[in-house]
Amino acid sequence: MILVNIDTYGFDCQSEGMPQIHFLDVTNRDGVQTARTGLSKFGKTMVNFYLGRLGVAQSEIGFPFLFHEVPYVRAQIALAEAGAFGDLRLSGWCRGVPQDVEKAVQVRAGGKGLAHYNLSISTSDYMLANKFRGKLDRDAVIREMTAAVRAAKAGGARTVGVNAEDGSRTDDGFLTEFALAAKEAGADRVRYCDTIGGDTPDRIRERFAKLASAVGMPVETHCHNDLGLAVANSIHGALGDLQAGQDAWINTCVNGIGERSGNADLLSTILAFRHAFDPQVNGSEIGDPIDLSWARRFALWASYAFGQPLPYNQVGVGRNAFAHESGIHADGALKDHGNYELYDDETLGPFPDDWHARRGRVVLTGEYGGKAGFRHVMDGLGVEPADEELSFKLVQLCNAQTSRPLTDDELRLIAEYPRELALLFSGAIE
């Protein structure tokens, strides 16, 4: 499709090879940092499974330099190689210092390590003064960051993104200097972090367009929701990238979870690029093969796994997202749901009907289950485990780790990829 739109910023969208939108989900890094909640390593594995099914480009899977993440990272590498996550790219997050990176690149499975990294360091004068407290100045920030980029590339990384933490409070001059130094060291993108969520759509678009033009590489959005603007800011930041002729990379989290008030919600952001009335937005080309038929299952699974109930008005997947009661609205929706609905709820996929949620007499499998119950459940799901004995042990271990009944999708993944998942429990399975 060829689109023609000259917007108020002077961006000519007429191109068959126009820049594209990509989604880099950070649920397994920023999302799991959410206070008062948590996610097991098996749960983080399921996030990658769902992101792969949804068609997202990349998952920031966690912290490969941390000792307790190492078995998990190895399992993700093995699962990706086995095809469990489709075309999903896996990336690791490190602080923007070479010591973290040197540890991370040593984590391997089957001789392969992570191919993608994001390296983060604070750039604002506020954080230099009040976080580092004189330990680092601007020159030191650039020195540490460039050394980290070179270490990642020397360790085999295909792509490296450099994160300007508190980028929204960093002046244009230093942001440009930081990004150009990163590019010279081998970085492929710079992540502009609206760390405390104070940016606004017009401001962030202007800054992205200016920065992406100045450095000649994509500026990645990382927007927090402290003012309720994370999705809007992510969209406008991406438009600034496109205006500068660069691909846009948008950070998201499932259900908008994340530090404090959360991050840009994955589903809301995708739906905006598909259904917003502004042709600059719905006319932007998404470069990822998004399959929204997995959206509802992912969102509801995440609510269950994180133990965070979805608000009734959660975009697309809340209980009231397609509910009508008042007279005028109900009448209009009964005649044609398009009168009061922007998109069809069926496009978001079916509601899960998990084995463990059945009522009445039911036989389950889990931490203390036996072979008969395990076989009964697998037969009921129509699943033939690749390795029955190993899958049986993994069901017990995963149930013990999550402290909740396993879902049908979790049981299917265990049955299909038991050898790779066993790496999560290094030393626990003989």
Model-derived segments and spans:
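N-terminal capping/small domains of soluble enzymes
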Residues: 1-98, 365, 369, 375, ...
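Active-site beta-loop-alpha junctions enriched in small/polar residues
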Residues: 26-29, 62-66, 93-97, 120-124, ...
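Catalytic alpha/beta core domains of metabolic enzymes, predominantly
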Residues: 196-339
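Short secondary-structure boundary/hinge segments and terminal tails
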Residues: 45, 68-70, 170-171, 200, ...
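Alpha/beta enzyme core
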Residues: 21-23, 33-56, 73-84, 98-217, ...
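Generic structural signal for well-ordered, non-membrane alpha-helical segments
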Residues: 37-44, 69, 97, 138-145, ...
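Hydrophobic alpha-helical scaffolding
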Residues: 37, 62, 94, 168, ...
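A mid-to-C-terminal "edge-of-domain" accessory segment
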Residues: 2-21, 25-27, 271-273, 277-430
